[in-house]
């Protein structure tokens, strides 16, 4: 049984470049250029992350979470939650990696945002499971970054009140609600359930979201989160306003 450990090394370490290997890479880059440079929409606003802090909701996070909820609203989904760490790039008007016009969004730019191949998962959570998931997500904003800041949640369809007891998040109230003023309806409580959509990394307990592994009526959609975002960009055609803040 191997008892060693991984060792970081310089990526070239003085090794000469092999022309035959470089040719394979160059061919692959050329073959995928058509897909990467395909324009899927336009934006007159920047969709940016809260980067590098990842301690609060972001315009890009709201866009992705809203797209998730909208995609599955017709099958009973009430809320969406994804993790900040899954968002790997911004969508900026000034970015033109494929030579496209400023403001145009390419498939490659969308892929840079969500490159991990995660799929969406729908499940029903109890109130207690939802609260536990949110408490895990709000650990970084409360100062507990021991597990990294990527767990900070980006969500849609929820209005959440919480406070920090030292470094421990305490969820005070959760509503099913659209962004805007504090809801005046009663918040969720014991006995309530919520149908949510998340990603398969979080569903498997990634970023500490073990509470999401215990949902019921689970539906593995098979839809890539990347495709859900692209579908929303194509549906809008042009993004002219930022998503409302929850």
Functional labels for PLM-detected ranges:
Residues 12, 16, 52-55, 220:
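Alpha-helix capping and helix-loop boundary segments enriched in small/acidic/polar residues
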Residues 36-57:
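Glycine-rich phosphate/diphosphate-binding loops and the adjacent beta-loop-alpha structural elements
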Residues 1-42, 159-166:
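Binuclear metal-dependent phosphoesterase catalytic core
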Residues 1-9, 58, 62-246:
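Feature captures C-terminal
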């Amino acid at each position: 049984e191997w008892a060693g450990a991984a060792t970081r090394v310089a990526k070239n370490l003085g090794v000469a470049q092999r022309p035959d290997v470089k040719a394979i890479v160059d061919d692959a880059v050329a073959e995928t250029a058509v897909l990467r440079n395909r324009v899927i929409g336009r934006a007159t606003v920047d969709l940016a992350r809260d980067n590098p802090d990842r301690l609060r909701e972001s315009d890009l996070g709201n866009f992705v979470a809203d797209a998730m909820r909208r995609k599955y609203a017709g099958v009973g989904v009430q809320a969406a939650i994804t993790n900040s760490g899954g968002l790997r790039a911004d969508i900026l008007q000034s970015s033109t990696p494929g030579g496209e016009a400023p403001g145009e969004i390419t498939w490659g730019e969308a892929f840079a945002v969500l490159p991990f191949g995660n799929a969406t998962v729908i499940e029903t959570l109890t109130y207690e499971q939802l609260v536990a998931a949110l408490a895990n997500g709000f650990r970084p904003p409360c100062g507990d970054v021991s597990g990294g800041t990527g767990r900070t949640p980006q969500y849609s369809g929820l209005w959440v009140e919480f406070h920090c007891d030292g470094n421990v998040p305490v969820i005070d109230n959760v509503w099913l609600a659209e962004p805007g003023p504090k809801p005046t309806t009663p918040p969720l409580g014991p006995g309530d359930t919520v149908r949510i959509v998340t990603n398969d990394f979080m569903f498997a307990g990634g970023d500490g979201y073990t509470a999401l592994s215990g949902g019921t009526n689970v539906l593995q959609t098979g839809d890539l989160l990347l495709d859900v975002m692209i579908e929303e960009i194509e549906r809008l055609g042009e993004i002219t306003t930022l998503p409302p803040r929850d």
